[in-house]
Amino acid sequence: MSPNACNLSCMTQNDLLSGLREALRAELKSGVEALRFMAEIERRKLYVERGFSSLFRFCVEGLGLTEDQACRRVAVVRAARRVPEVFELLANGELHMTGVAKLSKFMNDDNAHSLVEQARNKSKAEVEMLIATEFPGAKSCEDRVEAATLETFAFHFDGSAEAKALLDRAKELTPAGTDIGEIFEAALALYVDKLEKRKNGKTSRPRSKPAEDAPAGAAYVPAATRRAVVERDGARCTYVSPDGRRCSERSNLEFDHVGGRALGAKSVVGELRLLCRAHNLHAAREVQGHGFIARRIRAARAARTGQGPWNREPHGG
């Protein structure tokens, strides 16, 4: 028997109960402290240079958290960005991570403080009831995919009435006995094929070879060139960190002009690479500076909110 086990076995009932409470308080405190570290890492985007496309990827691939653990923590960090008091309320037990993570999906600058206040001292079920009351159209279950066997998976998600009607029609058009999984797989195959044609220039009958020359600074990337770059890069972000870690991101990839299109890079295979959004911005900062990217981000936000200079009333004179 280990010394720790011996110490526990020799404790009185009261000592065991008080020891457990103390251990749980320490666990809660250390958990909130970890969240504070994550929030600062997110603010500085420290994970980007180290080869991760997001805080979520860093938590899973860099820290070894499960996807569920990472999702909850990232959601809490984002909620705390709007309501910094979240950390203190978590530490003293007035909020719990599960509830904050659920609420985070519905928070905006206008309702964040109100939602946090309403969620104080509420159980998970009560937080879910709060969400159902405040957001009647909210999904009743979380999207998730779980392994059912070694080769099959169980999918859980909410769908619209239109999706149900499409499924019913698909069942009518397929042979009797075709299960929903087969219909779902066939529909996804068609959808993926459509997206690959649109985003990567994929086609069953390529009509041309990649261009060997193109005007400097040209924004348009021909389909044949896109196909060649995607194939060469393995449909994956090509960023490699200083310690040799290649980014694993395969979603929302962008064609980056090596050295910067604004500085004369051409839309040819040898001067293009695939980067995820985070590493494309990182590369742009390296080439054009933080100020340039900050101005672009501000301009994009202003355009979305209708506050850009092009939307202002002209001055009289």
Model-derived features with residue positions:
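N-terminal acidic-hydrophobic amphipathic loop/helix motif that frequently occurs adjacent to catalytic
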Residues: 1-63
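A boundary/linker detector
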Residues: 1-12, 18-21, 31-34, 117-317
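Generic alpha-helical segment signature
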Residues: 13, 27, 31, 76-79, ...
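Residue-level recognition of alpha-helical structural elements
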Residues: 16, 30, 48, 96, ...
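Secondary-structure capping and boundary motifs in well-ordered enzyme cores
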Residues: 26, 30, 47-51, 61-63, ...
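DNA major-groove recognition helix of helix-turn-helix
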Residues: 42, 74, 81, 131, ...
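Amphipathic alpha-helical "recognition" segments
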Residues: 52-125, 133, 148-149, 156, ...
